[in-house]
Amino acid sequence: MIEREYHTYLKLERGLSDNSIVAYKLDFNRLKTYMEEHQIDVVRATFDDLQAFVFETFKGIKSAKTQARLLSSIHSFYRFLLYHRYIEQDPSELLEMPRVEKHLPEVLSLEEIDAMIAQIDMSKPEGHRNRAIIEMLYGSGLRVSELTELRLSNIYRKEGYMRILGKGSKQRLVPISPVADEQFGYWLKDRSQLDIKPEASDIAFLNHYGRQLTRAMIFTIVKRLAEAAGIRKTISPHTLRHSFATHLLQNGADLRIIQQLLGLEYTVTTEIYT
């Protein structure tokens, strides 16, 4: 009962993305299993119980980010219990978060981005598609998940913008660059020649089987182009998004505008640009 309520709380009240909810569920199950093994009701756990769990669990977790997420999940569960009056005091309140070492993402120069684009074989059926993908990741700062879920019905080419469904199902409007729009127009013609599966009829980017592109496919496209261009940096679709924000900032854009374009809710997330 409480578990179902908690999952609903994560989705509807916290507005977390599906990926975040899956991670929080896994963390909760880990906590619940530990408490059951020690004959402790997870709802009635004390600070000492939680501290023992953290101490024991962290032995097998080397990543500070994973440790931080686990503690965040614990805090989230007990805040939920407190808010819904299952408990009178939050036993996780004094649990400390580990300091997460910040690693700045790689930034691509304009020359490097141009070099990647130059590697796209425009004679192939996927040429215009891949060019449009790079232009939208960099020119609009999309997350890879936002790109794979992009719908034709949310692209307003005449008006020059897209409606993006971001993390936590939050919507925002982002501009489409003239180059991205041009390449996307070419891709639409190629797309119309595919045997498009019914479930993918409104999906913007498809593979040659007429199915939705996956995040792994986008990663592969970006990585192969970077390697072909001789770029030795660690590159991912997020690198293009980060480069978009960095170049805007270097050219005098307001940090708050960049935050809105990226769909970042919390200022702390944009600290890497300050």
Stretches found by the model and what they are:
Residues 1-274:
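Conserved catalytic core of the tyrosine transesterase superfamily
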